Amino acid sequence: RSLRVGVIGAGMAGILAVIKLREAGITDIVCFEKADRVGGTWRENTYPGIGCDVPSHVYSYSFAPNPDFTRMFSPGHEIQAYLERVAVDHGVVPHLRLGDEVVSAIYDRGVWHLETARGHRADFDVVIAASGVLHHPRMPEIDGVDEFEGAMFHSARWDQDVPIDGRRVGVIGTGSTAVQITGALADRVEHFSLFQRTPQWIMPMDNKLFSDDQRATFRSEPHRLRELRDFLESAFAENFADAVVDAKSVRLEQIE
């Protein structure tokens, strides 16, 4: 009997899991996705300014380079389109069960028993959890928030029907999402307020465009794209190592 594998979630990790299982010769795979399409984080989040803070050609599968990314740091809709295309090109789609959220997973005598919100039941030898953590919005507990009469929503549930231009807008928090929203809205609104508990240290993003000629070169000479990816990965790894310093070091004192 072939190995039966259930994958929960069809975001970047879930898509990759199905692809690698197929490469290993496993074909009895079901990938459960609660939404109506793949994409995970990039499907769920549609707020103004959404983008990746990792270089486009690093934030992609090594076996599926994308010569058509338009910027060094991709906007969210380009990553979503990329993931949808990879799912088609690499045979993931036939294994998808969209709109079917897993609500129960019980392990008994060597078998996983899964049940979905639609009442479907299935048994698996192996279950891979790829549901992620960025699709459960957490609203802050603020006294009096229920009395606020204006539009209010979490960034992960952006209400596209609410007009923003020329309005008074407040954003709570200064994490990555808030920084992106601030940059996208500051010049569009009448008044913008950013409420933060702890100030961030922020530097400009050098988000240059890839020209038509560059993208054409990436398509016709794939090794050029691999070279760029390798360079970016190496540079980011080195920069990350440089950024992590001992709390008692002289260098940290210099930075501060």
Positions of predicted regions on the chain:
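Tryptophan-centric aromatic hotspots in well-structured domains and transmembrane helices
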Residues: 12, 42-44, 69, 101-115, ...
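Rossmann-like dinucleotide-binding core of oxidoreductases
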Residues: 2, 6-8, 12, 16-23, ...
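General N-terminal targeting signals
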Residues: 55, 59, 64, 69, ...
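Beta1-alpha1 glycine-rich phosphate/pyrophosphate-binding loop at the start
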Residues: 3-96, 196-197
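Feature captures the FAD/FMN-dependent oxidoreductase FAD-binding
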Residues: 71-135
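A broad, structure-centric signal for solvent-exposed, well-ordered loop/edge residues
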Residues: 49, 54, 59, 68, ...
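Short, flexible, glycine/charge-rich loop motifs used to bind or transfer phosphoryl groups or to couple energy/partner
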Residues: 49, 93, 104-105, 117-119, ...
